[in-house]
């Protein structure tokens, strides 16, 4: 068996990005997962292209920040300001539309590919595998 320690939330902020790079360089973790819709995403992409991140996965998120898809196309996932609902609110909703989740996850994947990232794994948000609309969309994305 092989244990891989992964640093989550690459792209969240520049400070988080620097911490993850430090952990990678120290051998404390082997890979990271990038969030494509966060304030530090562009900085994370630059660090990747500088060779400071050997392996990167995609951290799909539908509970933090703003969607990459126009909010009017994913209304079951966002609040009145166009921000993603937090995980507690989202997981309590009965009317989350699976197709909207799929649309957003695909947008995040395309953004990663368009940024020149070679994605070698992915993770779902907040154990989304236990929430039917996220599980179904994540399985297809």
Model features per residue range: what roles?
Residues 1-14:
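Boundary/entry segment of secreted carbohydrate-active catalytic domains
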Residues 2-4, 29-33, 53-59, 118-123:
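Structural preference for beta-strand elements that scaffold enzyme active sites
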Residues 8-10, 35-37, 59-63, 125-127:
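Active-site beta-loop-alpha junctions enriched in small/polar residues
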Residues 14-39:
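A short alpha/beta connector and helix-capping loop motif
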Residues 20-26, 42-55, 72-79, 113-114:
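Acidic (Asp/Glu)-rich catalytic clusters
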Residues 67-97:
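Active-site gating loops and adjacent loop-to-helix segments of metal-dependent hydrolytic enzymes
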Residues 95-109:
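Alpha-helical scaffold elements lining the catalytic groove of polysaccharide deacetylases
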Residues 106-141:
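Catalytic domains of cell-wall/extracellular-matrix polysaccharide-remodeling enzymes
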